[in-house]
Each structure stands twice: as structure tokens, then as C-alpha cells.
Amino acid sequence: MIVERVLYNIKDIDLEKLEVDFVDIEWYEVQKKILRKLSSNGIEVGIRNSNGEALKEGDVLWQEGNKVLVVRIPYCDCIVLKPQNMYEMGKTCYEMGNRHAPLFIDGDELMTPYDEPLMQALIKCGLSPYKKSCKLTTPLGGNLHGYSHSHSH
């Protein structure tokens, strides 16, 4: 099956009458233009994202009758911080940005994919990070696709 656009998002509808099949898209794949995946029910899915918009949790990629194929972003190990004041918020953003770490937000938690050296660096600079399994669905701007820039002087 080849999919070229998002039809709608499941948050907008009642799922009770639908037969839902999920395709897992990792947080770092949501902006890829071409993906090849296997759905939970074993259906091979080709996704051609020509409009460049990031896929979101709950996006419906295909529907036929009462059957739908829905994007699911799996949980992954994350570094989580809950800044208690503006100083901690600034320090967190500075340290993560300095390492080009993707930053996500959920309520009052800032999250980035788990990386032991980053965890140790955050502890060393006086912050209180902890490890937690999270869905990275709400990016806080910046670099999601792994591209970086250089600091040539």
C-alpha cells in the first residue's frame, strides 16, 4: 500500500466503529519524505510525504470502509527535566541547544531522547534530569531531522 497524504486525525472522530491498524513512526522519522513500514497487522506501507509536514500521532493515512491505518509514535527512553524557575529553564535550553539535542515539551516537562553523556552533563551543571519512557510528539521548535550546522571560525 502506498500512502501520499494524511486524511484526518483520529482525535477528530469516534473510533468505536472503526477497525484500527497502526503504523509505528519513530519521533525522528516524522518529517521524512519517504518511509517504508510494516503495520501492526503486517501490511507493508509506503509513505510518500510530499507536502513536507510532519506526521503526527493519530494521523489517519488510509481508510477503506471501517478500516483505518493510523500513525502511532512509540515510546522511547528520554531524559526529562522539570525546570523549577526561569534560571533552570534557561540552563536546560542552553545545554540542550549547545549539543543540538532535539527538545520536546509535555505540560511542564522538557524531554529529549536518552543519551548518557548528556544526562551526566545535565547533572554536572546542577540540573535534576531523570530517565522516563515517553512519546516524543510535541517538538519545541528547532532541529528534528538530525541535520546540524557547523561553527566554523
Curated annotation (Swiss-Prot):
Transmembrane segments: none annotated. One of its GO terms (cellular component) is cytoplasm. The keyword Electron transport does not apply. Its main location: cytoplasm. Keywords: Chaperone, Cytoplasm, Nickel, Nickel insertion. GO terms for biological process: protein folding; protein-containing complex assembly; urea metabolic process. The keyword Cytoplasm applies. GO terms for molecular function: nickel cation binding; unfolded protein binding. HAMAP family: UreE. This is Urease accessory protein UreE.
